[in-house]
Amino acid sequence: MGTVVPLPRLVDAHCHLGDVAFDPDRAAVLERARQAAVQHVVVIGTTLSDSERSAALAGAGAGLSATAGVHPHEARTWSAETPARLKALLALPEVVAVGETGLDYHYDHSPRDAQRRAFEAQLALAAELHKPVVVHARDADADVAALLTGVPVPVVLHSFSSGPTVFEAGMAIGAYFSFSGMITFKHWQWTVRPSDCPADRLLIETDAPYLAPVPHRGKRNEPSFVGAVAAALARARGEALEDLAARTSDNARRVFGARLDSTL
């Protein structure tokens, strides 16, 4: 009988587990993740109510952490009361980062000036609370790069696909580059190669239920698929999957903290 090789341990650094897409089978989704060697999932908040839901999920189960923030699509909802409500969530031990925040000039679901105000406010909140911040950047490279200059806390560039301007700004502040299922897409054009990113600044994520990786394209994404992202990133960098998986898990623990020692 041959030797059984254990699956590498994995961390899904960005998942919208509170999304209604998971309401019918959330427990089964997490069990599949556990069976696929996913040891921890970071559950992302995108609005105040979504952040509350993410925190509740993380507080109720092992192997889950949460973030709290307002997505650029929802920046128009930012009000004078928002910072205090986010602060209350960020005081919870299961809430490990600010975000998802940032700028999205592709869809412009919120006015750009509102996006910038909300992003700046959340960067300031992260600095005040000494929390890492999860950043969404799409078609807004110059403004994102400018606003990231000098940020004193760890920055995660989620689903990284930006060009050299954001890459160089991220490098200057020691940001983490988190790769999603997009790295598996056949026709995706990368302007910054995954091999350009420092090994100690790599993360992997699903962004579930969105961006299902090959060979799961067309399906609802879920944390158990993060292994496909790890495999693609390892191939792109010419590394062994086991080494890449262990390194990205260690990196996630470094940026998000000891909460990630809790496992599914």
Per-region residue spans from a language model:
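Mid-domain alpha/beta scaffold segments of enzyme catalytic cores
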Residues: M1-L264
